[in-house]
């Protein structure tokens, strides 16, 4: 410590020499001879600290606390200044918009769209059939009879159904009536049960009537000719 005190004291002769030359030596700012003396003084002080371990520990702790205080105070002052000026949000930057975020989830592309293969078949709610996705709309239109062509087809089907039901009812009534009147023809019609067979029966009856009429006409002609 005595060495430090001796090194930091300035003799009057030195001050007088500096004043005579028109220069004033300030520690750390001197030039020429004064700067060299300041450097020597710092080196001497550093060597004095290294000789005593206790002084070295104190110096290191002091330096560490000083650095921590300066760094912390600088951060606090800067944050306070940004808060007061309204520029605190500039530290984080602009927030990224959700529309431009890149998706990194599995089975999804960078835009968040699923990359899994979608089923190409659809189930019809009316007939429970599997239909291709490209043909689902026209199939549903036809299946439910919503379009123009589909409505025409549906009306035709309805008309044919009504016609077949009416023809079947008329044929059944005819078979019942024929069975009540006479045995052979009605029984034969009941055995067949179709309109075509009924038409054949009518044609056979007409043929029988024509044959009887022709035989009568032939007999009358023979009588007129008096051929006995």
UniProtKB/Swiss-Prot annotation:
The long N-terminal helix forms part of the 'assembly lobe' of the SAGA deubiquitination module. Residues 180-193 have a biased composition (Gly residues). Coiled coil: none annotated. This is SAGA-associated factor 11 homolog 2. It holds the Pfam family Sgf11. GO terms for biological process: chromatin organization; mRNA export from nucleus; positive regulation of DNA-templated transcription; protein transport; regulation of transcription by RNA polymerase II. Residues 1-34, 154-228 are annotated as: Disordered. Belongs to the SGF11 family. A zinc finger (SGF11-type) spans 122-143. PANTHER family: ATAXIN-7-LIKE PROTEIN 3. Residues 1-11, 19-34, 214-228 have a biased composition (Low complexity). GO terms for cellular component: cytoplasm; DUBm complex; nuclear pore; nucleoplasm; SAGA complex. One of its GO terms (molecular function) is zinc ion binding.
